[in-house]
Curated annotation (Swiss-Prot):
Pathway given in the UniProt record: Cell wall biogenesis; peptidoglycan biosynthesis
MF-aspect GO terms: FAD binding; UDP-N-acetylmuramate dehydrogenase activity
GO terms under biological process: cell division; cell wall organization; peptidoglycan biosynthetic process; regulation of cell shape
Native species: Leifsonia xyli subsp. xyli (strain CTCB07)
Subcellular location: Cytoplasm
Protein name: UDP-N-acetylenolpyruvoylglucosamine reductase
Function: Cell wall formation.
Amino acid sequence: MTDPPALSALTTMRVGGTPERLLEPADRDALVATAREVWSTGDEWLLLGGGSNTIAADDGFEGTVLRIVTRGVERLAAEKGRIRLRVQAGEPWDALVALTVRNGWAGIEALSGIPGSTGAAPVQNIGAYGQEIESALIGVEFLDYLTGEVYTLARAELGLGYRTSALKRGMAGVVLSVDLELADHSVPGGVGASLSAPIAYAQLADALAVPLGSRVSVDELRRAVLALRASKGMVLDPADPDSVSAGSFFTNPIVSENVARALPSDAPRWSLGPPEPDTILSLGPEGVHPLDVPPFAAGPYEAKLSAAWLIENAGIRSGFALPGSGAAISSKHTLAIVNRGAATAADVAQLASFVRGRVQADFGVVLHPEPVLVGLTL
């Protein structure tokens, strides 16, 4: 594209300058060929999907933005009662969820309303309302940056952790497609009447007025999730200024038992077992992947904390903004930073740094951003 748009036009936070180049390969084969060509130049490159998890600097990007727009959903052979899908990386995630619900397939219905592309879902290891993509993920087709080869990577090879993966932490390349396996819990009643996976999130169970572990129709569960997300400004809506964001800006921190015990007694925390180390199977000719991917966690981390609680109890409330800034904490959800209409990327980074500094000063816990920051530091 000879005259690319600013990244503010391609991201949900609506900030970011103009890249040098923007390429949008139309299909899988063109994506492979284009990526290899870009990599052969040695220039800087950036992958961009739906733009819901990327915040780019105001001066743009000095290099090539490779925008993933490939589409398509293919049904694969599967055992009775199971559904297998191969989804092209550029397929919008929520459109995929809507498709599965219409067909009565269960397994990702609680992930309704999450913006972005399907290829980014395993990279970020998305999850919400008690459901994780990890539980439905079979694997991905992956174009490796270092070798230029296309590999099929099983779920166990992706180093999945809480909102992270080896793909996010340094395993450079392009996810070409994602394979998922869902359940077909069909019951009489027509489209959307199949039963959901057991409800594992208290707020969702309360919204549906059912006990934890219950099942409702996948359609009913999707509608409940979308309503909950909309109440927090977490569904893209031109009429809702709180939806001009990158979703939750900070992940819930995972800390040691000692750090968790030092917090006030009313601080929410969830006990965790020690994480399993990454398993990256052979991709290189010597039997070892040529890139050393850092593990998800190096020590016996045992508790997950609520980032929202930490932010609120550090004195930062909904709607908070720094003087003269176009960025603010969402009026509906303290985990989200929103563009109030004229924010710059610098405004967003400044507010995020302020929030992180307050939490660290008050509780000794460092919050980590969930979106990918391009040309920005906190």
